[in-house]
């Protein structure tokens, strides 16, 4: 098993990694998460071991690479997909455990600047979640720490994670809701009183990027 772990919220991280180790999984992580794991004595590989490319732009680009996304998106029952992986020497990814930068917490601070808010817009994490959700039949998606223990227990007891569990965990409905809700966000936010130009941009970004199991329309209403 190969797992990518990249989390801003480190709750349950050590326990998840230990459980994966017990299943002989190889863990790949971005710099911050890898450092937290290594501090706990847990063996971890950098994501650059998958991509052959370093993290750049002060960490703005870490996981956005075909070697990662092809490994997540490849359907295991489609021979052409497996052939593509083999031809390009890409390893399939079996689990994605990701949660996002604390964007909402940042913009909730009265002293938060627009630049600080922009830096908390998560690009790679959102993309990883969307890719894994699209291929949940083959990839276990973990976005909430409270899901770690039951999933690892199922994996340890049964040797696999069932389709029903994978479907329940994958935020497919949220991905669809956000895509459909973006039009609502863009149309409505420009007419709200009290939202400046920067505030509108940040609010629209939430509609695009927040993945915490709430629909985009609900997010727009909360912002307004």
Predicted ranges, named:
Residues 1-50:
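N-terminal glycine-/serine-/threonine-rich phosphate-binding loop
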Residues 5, 26-31, 45-49, 74, ...:
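General beta-strand structural signal in soluble alpha/beta enzymes
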Residues 32-103:
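Glycine-rich nucleotide/cofactor/substrate-binding loop typically near the N-terminus or early
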Residues 90-186:
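Internal alpha/beta core interface subdomains
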Residues 180-183, 207-211, 222:
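Intrinsic disorder/low-complexity segments
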Residues 187, 203-205, 215-216:
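Short linear motifs in low-complexity or flexible loops
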Residues 216-223:
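Short, intrinsically disordered C-terminal tails of secreted or membrane-associated proteins
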